[in-house]
Regions:
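Active-site histidine-anchored catalytic micro-motif
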Residues: 1-94
Length: 94
């Protein structure tokens, strides 16, 4: 629950802007109830992931995703304190 899926122009400026925006909403330097309860220090990561969301719908036309010219689907891991693996599930419905 610390990962999120979205679309973004995968470019350093936009990535920096997103990082800054999420830090305004869920700053690193405030206490989180989750951290007090579990002691794992990633409360902010759970909040950021909840705001971005765990899923995404992308329309398909002619067998291709309908994305903007520079738009890409990305998985954001918002708790980078340790290495982990993630499984991405893609479901196509007619």
């Amino acid at each position: 629950s610390t990962a999120a899926v979205t679309t973004i122009e995968y470019e350093q400026g936009v990535l920096s802007d997103l990082r800054r925006a999420l830090s305004v909403v869920a700053p690193d330097d405030i206490p989180y109830a989750h951290d007090r309860r579990w002691g794992d220090g990633n409360g902010r990561s759970h909040v950021k992931a909840a705001l971005v969301g765990p899923s995404l719908s992308v329309p398909i036309a002619g067998g291709e995703p309908m994305l903007g010219t520079w738009q890409q689907v990305v998985l954001l891991e918002l708790d980078v304190r340790r290495e982990r693996s993630r499984t991405v599930v893609v479901t196509v419905t007619p």
